[in-house]
Amino acid sequence: IANRHPRVNIHQPGPGVGGYCIPVASAFLAAGTDVSTPTINGARRVNSIQPKRTADQLFELLTGITNPVVAVLGVAYKGNVGDARATPADTIIERLEKSGATVKVHDPLSINSRHNLVSLESALEDANAVMFITDHDQFKQIDPTTAAKLMSGRIVFDGRNILPLKPWQEAGFTVTRLGDGTTHSAT
């Protein structure tokens, strides 16, 4: 039942849940009742640390790179929408910047991002790594060979498990997928 809504896929790993309705709705459901909500509270706690963990995972992949440049693709809180309210991308970007990375952000749909958005080409240019935070359909169509020509590094962090693995590996990228526990080396 939980995964039947056409706009959600709650069983898919990701960098955190965003948007304005989940934090408000879960608090609203519990407010004014004597009902204990340990599951909701636990889920909110896990969700609050997931963006930090995601940023830290990418930064581990950048070990040994001085002044790393990261292309962050997607700031909307979910795929194929432009809404960037309460997005996990904000925490991820801030944490990467505090760790010393230069972050270039691209989102073709975002209407209310607090970040300076650039074109896809500008985001990828000279980047050591590209991090997919939002699962926009457009991102699935990015040509890995073109990305390789623009980037200085070959690190992909797929935070939504949306990329076809083989073409990215064949273009020389090492791909880490959030939630599958492995890093897939270039072929």
Feature locations, PLM:
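Structural/interface elements that position substrates and couple domains in central-metabolism enzymes
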Residues: I1-T187
